[in-house]
Amino acid sequence: VIDGEKWVAGVEPDRLQGWERGLHGDYPSTKPYKALFYAALLMSEQKEIDVLVTGLPVSQYMDVERREALKSRLEGEHQITPKRSVAVKSVVVVPQPAGAYMDVVSSTKDEDLLEIIQGGKTVVIDPGFFSVDWVALEEGEVRYHSSGTSLKAMSVLLQETDRLIQEDHGGAPGIEKIEKAIRAGKAEIFLYGEKSALD
């Protein structure tokens, strides 16, 4: 429940009618973002979170005020359902791709891989819906001048795919249907009762 309204989160975009994903730089201050945040808190099954780590696109992460605003929104007591609240003691904001790097470093059992990524140079690329972000790391430290963000992200690719399918077939399946097929590893979708290739 957000501001007295019931929300759902974690549902495939094509399952919701009349809903569009926000594609703007202030997404972390929106109700859909808060709904996803609350869903994550609920799924944690915890009453208290000592440290919550979240990410921002690299270009937004570079803005200290934006980082601090997100941190202050997420810290504190959150009433996530009428009978459940979760306290978040501390929030750490990182550049989005750095989270994948930290996950590999903390979870890999491959000593050779760990030696390579901790002692060498690594680039982590995060092709998201809103932005494509990349982080360059050297010996585990982020090199901010070699890291960045592009807004020519998955949303742009999906829109162009939708446009090309419409151009070829006279109808567009919609970006949600295309995205769902790609996530499922499918190379085709149904359009007008026939299979249409995504390549």
Language model: regions and residue ranges:
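Conserved catalytic-loop position in the HRD/HxD motif
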Residues: V124-G128
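Short beta-strand scaffold segments in enzyme catalytic cores
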Residues: V132-A136
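Short, glycine/acidic-enriched loop or turn micro-motifs at the edges of active sites
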Residues: G99, F129-F130
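P-loop NTP-binding/switch modules centered on Walker-like glycine-rich loops
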Residues: T161
